[in-house]
Curated annotation (Swiss-Prot):
<dbReference type="GO" id="GO:0001671">
    <property type="term" value="F:ATPase activator activity"/>
</dbReference>
<dbReference type="GO" id="GO:0051117">
    <property type="term" value="F:ATPase binding"/>
</dbReference>
<dbReference type="GO" id="GO:0003714">
    <property type="term" value="F:transcription corepressor activity"/>
</dbReference>
<dbReference type="InterPro" id="IPR002939">
    <property type="entry name" value="DnaJ_C"/>
</dbReference>
<dbReference type="GO" id="GO:0000122">
    <property type="term" value="P:negative regulation of transcription by RNA polymerase II"/>
</dbReference>
<dbReference type="GO" id="GO:0044183">
    <property type="term" value="F:protein folding chaperone"/>
</dbReference>
<dbReference type="InterPro" id="IPR051339">
    <property type="entry name" value="DnaJ_subfamily_B"/>
</dbReference>
<dbReference type="InterPro" id="IPR018253">
    <property type="entry name" value="DnaJ_domain_CS"/>
</dbReference>
<dbReference type="InterPro" id="IPR008971">
    <property type="entry name" value="HSP40/DnaJ_pept-bd"/>
</dbReference>
<feature type="domain" description="J">
    <location>
        <begin position="2"/>
        <end position="70"/>
    </location>
</feature>
<dbReference type="GO" id="GO:0005654">
    <property type="term" value="C:nucleoplasm"/>
</dbReference>
<dbReference type="GO" id="GO:0034605">
    <property type="term" value="P:cellular response to heat"/>
</dbReference>
<dbReference type="GO" id="GO:0051085">
    <property type="term" value="P:chaperone cofactor-dependent protein refolding"/>
</dbReference>
<dbReference type="InterPro" id="IPR001623">
    <property type="entry name" value="DnaJ_domain"/>
</dbReference>
<protein>
    <recommendedName>
        <fullName>DnaJ homolog subfamily B member 1</fullName>
    </recommendedName>
</protein>
<dbReference type="GO" id="GO:0090084">
    <property type="term" value="P:negative regulation of inclusion body assembly"/>
</dbReference>
<feature type="region of interest" description="Disordered">
    <location>
        <begin position="68"/>
        <end position="90"/>
    </location>
</feature>
Amino acid sequence: MGKDYYQTLGLARGASDEEIKRAYRRQALRYHPDKNKEPGAEEKFKEIAEAYDVLSDPRKREIFDRYGEEGLKGSGPSGGSSGGTNGTSFSYTFHGDPHAMFAEFFGGRNPFDNFFGQRNGEEGMDIDDPFSGFPMGMGGFTNMNFGRSRPAQEPTRKKQDPPVTHDLRVSLEEIYSGCTKKMKISHKRLNPDGKSIRNEDKILTIEVKRGWKEGTKITFPKEGDQTSNNIPADIVFVLKDKPHNIFKRDGSDVIYPARISLREALCGCTVNVPTLDGRTIPVVFKDVIRPGMRRKVPGEGLPLPKTPEKRGDLIIEFEVIFPERIPQTSRTVLEQVLPI
């Protein structure tokens, strides 16, 4: 079952925009890592930011209300578009920095750092909401000085948000041939006035080269959320292999697990080995095959990343299936012919 963003913010469905803002304000202050040191607070803080990102956007909220998280992220009902992925791999993923969202909401990069130092021990302070005495939104802190005084003309130095990483799942066949992946993201962009923000969709195109290794990173600079206080994060996709129903990958080699009987292991056999491009190679074995033994078929693996015209090997890994019972007559024959 997918996430319930209303439950994350402690809201009922049908909550007003003002109720959503108040709920985000309350929960974000409660679980901010600078205040809440409990295990899991950082992850909860991120979940709260994602919930607010969806519910504060009318279009995302409408899709979520109709299809849930699965529909919002492109894996909803197969009969509909659930947001219109247009053939892309997903329609929505939270790419924002929860700390930047918090700063934008309250009008300061991280008010916790100095605020608690100034009000530490003050009576009547609301522990869950230390900013309860101030207005909500960008205007609440614009005329307040947190920490050491600073000349008015000194500009605030912007910092880039940390990279936002996502897995990019590809099949062995796609690594073998190379492929193109189109990933749809939704991020926030700063309007020309330098203050207001719009939501913007963008298609990121990834050319997966033949033979790329698992763990290869593809970076799209500054494609994360943009605010007046930050430099957008880089969006980074990390290549991950999809599980294959036949092969296992070992670098540029592929491993084919061959199951043979004890008789075949002792007397020899022919193994019909499939390849990634759909062919079948018959490989003859005349010697005794031991459990776990490996044999290479050279040049039938994946392309090498730096020299894709060359290929790794296809490795046959044997599993010998022993019989559960042997008739007495067969046992007698085996005792006579097998070496001690």
